[in-house]
């Protein structure tokens, strides 16, 4: 487990609006809630809007990052996903966590203050040390340079 400090940027968090929590003991990610001045906002069909979380995290440890993911129920039932599909929080970022919500459906969707809109997952990472080569010394792999579905559907 990694200890991650956070700042509360909106005084309603921890009272009127719950702080991030793991929904169950087996949950991999914390639920992040919508924080804005209004009681609700409407995302029109195909609209993308940046929604605040009212929180800032400082992961600090360069061996970790945060990944922001959509909530599966919002995407499946309502067409609400992340505008950038997945978000990355670098360990040295200290600003407010904002969620780009995109309504990819043809129906307006009302986002309510305090609604769970995304998930925040902390993952270990490894920074690579890249070095140029003319060719790869290892023998050709089974995959080689094939990509984009080259192994077929079945």
Swiss-Prot record:
It catalyses: dUTP + H2O = dUMP + diphosphate + H(+). One of its GO terms (biological process) is dUMP biosynthetic process. Its EC number is 3.6.1.23. Keywords: Hydrolase, Magnesium, Metal-binding, Nucleotide metabolism. It comes from the Bacteria. Its cofactor is Mg(2+). Pathway: Pyrimidine metabolism; dUMP biosynthesis; dUMP from dCTP (dUTP route): step 2/2. One of its GO terms (molecular function) is magnesium ion binding. Substrate binds at residues 71-73, 84, 88-90, 98. It is an enzyme of class 3 (hydrolase). The keyword Cell wall biogenesis/degradation does not apply. The keyword Hydrolase applies. SUPFAM superfamilies: dUTPase-like. InterPro entries: dUTPase, dUTPase-like, dUTPase-like_sf, dUTPase_trimeric. It holds the Pfam family dUTPase. Belongs to the dUTPase family. HAMAP family: dUTPase_bact. This enzyme is involved in nucleotide metabolism: it produces dUMP, the immediate precursor of thymidine nucleotides and it decreases the intracellular concentration of dUTP so that uracil cannot be incorporated into DNA. This is Deoxyuridine 5'-triphosphate nucleotidohydrolase. It comes from Dichelobacter nodosus (strain VCS1703A). The gene is dut.
């Amino acid at each position: 487990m990694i200890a991650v400090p956070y700042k509360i940027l909106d005084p309603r968090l921890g009272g009127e609006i719950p702080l991030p929590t793991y929904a169950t003991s087996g949950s991999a990610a914390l639920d992040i809630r919508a924080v804005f001045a209004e009681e609700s906002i409407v995302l029109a069909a195909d609209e993308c809007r940046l929604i605040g979380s009212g929180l800032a995290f400082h992961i600090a440890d360069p061996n970790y990052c945060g990944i922001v993911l959509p909530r599966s129920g919002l995407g499946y039932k309502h067409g609400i996903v992340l505008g950038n599909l997945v978000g990355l929080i670098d360990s040295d970022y200290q600003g407010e966590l904002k969620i780009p919500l995109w309504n990819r459906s043809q129906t307006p969707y009302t986002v309510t203050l305090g609604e769970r809109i995304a998930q925040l997952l902390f993952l270990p990472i490894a920074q690579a040390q890249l070095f140029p080569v003319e060719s790869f010394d290892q023998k050709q792999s089974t995959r080689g340079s094939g990509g984009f579905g080259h192994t077929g559907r079945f």
